[in-house]
Design a protein with these regions (language model features):
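Membrane-proximal basic amphipathic "stem/tether" segments
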Residues: 306-370
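Conserved catalytic-core segment of nucleotide-activated headgroup transferases in glycan assembly
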Residues: 69-72, 79-207, 214, 264
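Catalytic binding pocket for nucleotide-activated donors in carbohydrate/polymer assembly enzymes
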Residues: 24, 153-315
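Short, glycine/acidic-rich beta->alpha junctions
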Residues: 6-7, 28-32, 143-147, 209-213
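Extended catalytic core of nucleotide-activated donor transferases of GT-like folds
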Residues: 1-66, 81-87
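A structural motif corresponding to the C-terminal end of an alpha-helix
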Residues: 14-21, 125-136, 220-224
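Short amphipathic alpha-helical segments and helix-helix/interface helices
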Residues: 9-15, 36-40, 122-126, 151-152, ...
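Short catalytic/ligand-binding loop motif for oxyanion handling, primarily in non-cytosolic enzymes
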Residues: 2, 31-35, 55-60, 82, ...
Length: 370
């Protein structure tokens, strides 16, 4: 099947391949699940980085694979090239000719109601907005998609942009949702999404939460384009009214959304908040991600766990009060380390207990001597 990762069987059997720590990054995990799970087990993958939220990682990967370490990651981070492009192309608001822009494309019905939001927000916005003072450039056709530098120029020319959470609301772990959907459409080729959803898809809806912040949010923040988004969690990164103007999914607050957008002071504050927190902070840069990634490997490599942990503590605890972001990540990492499936936990419980005591002792020492 397309998008399937395959490795030469002989290569996977090599001794060094089996003994070397292996890391896999996954996105678009809502289909081809069985192939992915088999790949992890057959290839002896040790680390899985996934867009599945932390609370569901064990349900999907912990119970179905032998991977030792499971981590949530984003679909993308802030590249230096994005910042450079934004700095070169960004326009003052009064020089942008498009008030609100958007691009999307239809997704298969079997991806669920969440996936249909990507076109629905644009379709309903066009239908419901009756404001002659707004210049809209909202299109949902495959032929209307924009790529590369042209996409950056488009964002730079928009004062605002619509958006929804990335991901889907149906996580088709065994492929049955797709199969039933396709079978129904074969018999009813003109069926609407609502008809197909009611007939076969409803039981699969929202069983696994698989929604995430889109890289488009970072792009809009970098170009200082105001985001008008459907309400959502956005990985806890975006806050409504602070980083974006929240639009209810039934459009019941559309008038208030437009009022806020037309309020230059409020709109500019939202834009600046998004830029400072998502871009200028560096918190979501690839550089920061790689630093955290390296920390993870150092802490969890099989050789000399204790020595590496002590070294990390010496380096990080001294900066305890200066790098609050590191504390947040460190605690999150420790929580991830103690969340393998219970059947694999027994052999490690004494070690984790000792590590926890060591950490608490060092934190207590630093707090007392600060």
């Amino acid at each position: 099947k397309k998008n399937r990762i395959d490795l030469n069987a002989k290569y996977r059997d090599e001794k060094y391949w089996k003994e070397t720590p292996k890391i896999a990054f996954f996105q678009d995990e809502y289909h081809y699940c069985e192939e992915r799970l088999n790949f992890i087990n057959e290839s002896n993958i040790n680390y899985v980085y996934s867009c599945v939220p932390e609370r569901s990682l064990n349900e999907i990967y912990g119970k179905n694979t032998n991977a030792e370490f499971l981590f949530e990651s984003l679909t993308g981070y802030v590249e230096d090239s994005l910042i450079a492009s934004a700095n070169a192309l960004r326009k003052p608001f009064d020089q942008r000719s498009i008030d609100i822009g958007y691009r999307a494309r239809p997704l298969p019905y079997y991806n669920g109601r969440g996936a249909q939001e990507k076109t629905r927000i644009g379709e309903q916005f066009i239908e419901l907005v009756d404001d002659p003072n707004l210049e809209l450039d909202i299109k949902m056709g495959e032929e209307d998609r924009i790529y590369g530098k042209d996409w950056h120029r488009f964002i730079a020319n928009c004062k605002g942009m619509l958006g929804v959470e990335a991901g889907t609301s149906i996580f088709d772990i065994d492929g049955t949702a797709e199969a039933k959907c396709n079978a129904y459409l074969a018999q009813h080729p003109d069926a609407s999404f609502e008809e197909v959803h009611e007939a076969v898809l409803e039981p699969y809806e929202d069983k696994v939460f698989y929604r995430t912040i889109s890289p488009r949010a970072f792009e809009c923040a970098a170009f200082k384009t105001c985001m008008i988004l459907f309400e959502g969690s956005y990985n806890g990164i975006l806050e409504p009214h602070k980083h974006y103007i929240p639009l209810k999914k039934d459009f019941s607050n559309l008038d208030q959304v437009l009022k806020t957008f037309h309020d230059e002071e409020k709109r500019n504050q939202i834009v600046e908040n998004a830029y400072e927190d998502l871009i200028a902070s560096g918190e979501y840069s690839y550089k920061k991600f790689i630093e955290d990634f390296d920390t993870t490997l150092n802490l969890t490599s099989s050789d000399s766990w204790k020595d590496r942990l002590k070294l990390y503590l010496v380096e990080q605890m001294l900066g305890l009060f200066k790098k609050l972001g590191q504390i947040k990540y460190f605690l999150k990492l420790i929580l991830n380390l103690v969340r393998p499936p219970l059947e694999r936990l027994e052999m490690r419980v004494r070690f984790y207990f000792a590590v926890s005591l060591f950490i608490l002792k060092n934190i207590s020492f630093i707090l007392k001597n600060k």
